[in-house]
């Protein structure tokens, strides 16, 4: 299993002239698979942040009983979801391949979604497994992004964050 090591490069800017939505509308066509996530907790404004994620580096998707890893070196791995290898095992195995260090590294996680149909992987509830020709979105999709724009409305700050690859390590094998 390869280990991907990244460091963060960051720049903080004044964010009072930009909103998350207006910024996202400007960049979404330039960066396919971009994402906008806004905080809906208006009670604790000190932790109220919005995120724009751009340029996927790697992803893990769960669909039709299979976990699919897409890695930064363009490799792809498939792992069947079973009673012995559950969704949480797949997510942990994927996440363990990445190490991020540097300032604001806590923002550099997996961003994505879990659909309602993913309940089949956690509860004994039958869900019809159908395939759509036009929109066959995975039950779960989580992406590690190269660029993040973090809006802190409480401080009127906008943080630009980049993940820079510093090392790919191969596993050591005993001889």
Regions found by a protein language model. Name each.
Residues 69-77, 161-165:
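Secondary-structure transition/turn motif
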Residues 55-56, 61-66, 71-74, 150-156:
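Short acidic-glycine loop/turn motifs at beta-strand connectors
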Residues 104-132:
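Extended, Lys/Arg-enriched charged tracts that mediate electrostatic binding to polyanionic substrates
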Residues 166-175:
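Single conserved hydrophobic/aromatic residue that forms the stacking wall/gate
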Residues 39-41, 115-120, 144-147, 151-153, ...:
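Short, structured patches in soluble enzyme cores that scaffold and shape functional sites
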Residues 84-101, 124-136:
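Short acidic (Asp/Glu) patches
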Residues 59-60, 131-154:
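Structural signature of FAD isoalloxazine-binding scaffolds in flavoprotein oxidoreductases
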Residues 1-61:
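An N-terminal JmjN-like helical accessory module and its immediate linker preceding a catalytic domain
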């Amino acid at each position: 299993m390869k280990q991907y090591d990244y460091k963060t490069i960051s720049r903080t800017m004044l964010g009072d002239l930009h909103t998350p939505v207006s910024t996202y509308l400007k960049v979404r066509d330039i960066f396919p698979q971009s994402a906008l996530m806004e905080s809906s907790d208006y009670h604790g404004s000190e932790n109220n942040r919005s995120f724009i994620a751009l340029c996927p580096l790697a992803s893990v998707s769960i669909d039709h009983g299979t976990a699919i890893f897409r890695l930064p070196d363009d490799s792809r791995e498939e792992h069947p979801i079973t009673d012995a290898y559950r969704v949480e095992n797949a997510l942990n195995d994927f996440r363990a391949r990445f190490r991020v260090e540097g300032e604001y590294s806590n923002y550099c996680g997996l961003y994505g979604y879990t659909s309602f149909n993913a309940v089949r992987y956690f509860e004994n509830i039958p869900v019809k497994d159908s395939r759509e020709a036009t929109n066959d979105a995975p039950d779960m999709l989580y992406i590690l992004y190269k660029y993040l724009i973090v809006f802190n409305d409480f401080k009127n700050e906008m943080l630009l964050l980049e993940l820079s690859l510093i090392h790919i390590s191969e596993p050591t094998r005993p001889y």
